[in-house]
């Protein structure tokens, strides 16, 4: 089974992760807590913590229950799933004595386009509703517009609509960066482009022929565009200060 297919179909549930975390915090005492105080605890950097299996196994929720017992933490959660609203009670509890920030991943608000490029992901509207629900609960929430897909999700009018709706939902910031293609990702992504967006195939091959990043001129232009949109709609960038 190719890696990209295994990523979706072979789900390893770390059932005892909450207990391991609780034991480490309990037995490690101040030494262990000293390692995480002052640093950011990032949940969702490798896989979505609210993927469908979370409904059944509740691993993320139980981890949050453990973290809720320890004040003074800095926690960031990255997800594209509205399932996170299930845990609003815990998030607000944590926010009373720690800093917690949720980042919703969203690269387009076009439902039909989203269906083509993220066919098994929650709809853009459901993510925006989740964002609004978190903000209503007082949770600091932003958006990751990552990756921006050259020629697909970078239309100026589409990006304007994205930032407008993100700001209207109450997001405090939005971060963005262009698509990066490592060799393994290129082997999967370029055939997808040839199938779904054949008119862009030659452009992608040329743009990513010398490395994982699209050209500097494109990246600089994208940064300028998002800076202008942030200013227009009164929303911050992706950096937490």
Language-model segments: which ranges?
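Auxiliary Fe-S-binding modules of radical SAM enzymes
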Residues: 151-241
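Amphipathic alpha-helical segments that form well-ordered structural scaffolds
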Residues: 20, 66, 133, 221, ...
